[in-house]
Amino acid sequence: MAARLGNITFDCDDALKMAAFWSAVLGRPLDKGSSEVFASIGGADAGRKEPAWYFNKVPEPKQAKNRVHLDLVNPDPAAVDELVQLGAMVTGQHQIPGQHWTVMEDPEGNVFCIANKAFTG
């Protein structure tokens, strides 16, 4: 069996705030009708090439560190500063020969990384 990634879904406290943050990060617009309860990016695009992003308001708070996180790629050194201006927080920086990445948290504390290039091998 082979499956493909169709959507990325976040449980969150404020769906609109989270969707607005990720919309700015990804350079993709919010879908019409997005609200504090449910918001989406790319969900209305039937012919999409990238996964849709969904944000659902849930009553319970985040309890622990993510067991899965997103790895973003942007070679521009200014990308980390731009993410901080959008509301992200830097929690760590790492480097190996030819590769560097910054560990960050989005406005609701979900961990993600941004690297200068995609990880290989």
Kindly give the residue locations of the regions a language model identified.
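Vicinal oxygen chelate
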Residues: 14-15, 70-108
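Core segments of cupin and vicinal oxygen chelate
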Residues: 2, 9-53, 85
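Active-site beta-strand termini and strand-to-loop segments that position acidic
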Residues: 41-46, 104-107, 117
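A short acidic/small-residue loop/turn micro-motif
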Residues: 98, 118-121
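Short acidic/glycine-enriched loop/turn segments that link adjacent beta-strands
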Residues: 35-38, 64, 96-100
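Short, solvent-exposed beta-strand edge segments and adjacent coil->beta transition regions
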Residues: 5-7, 65-69
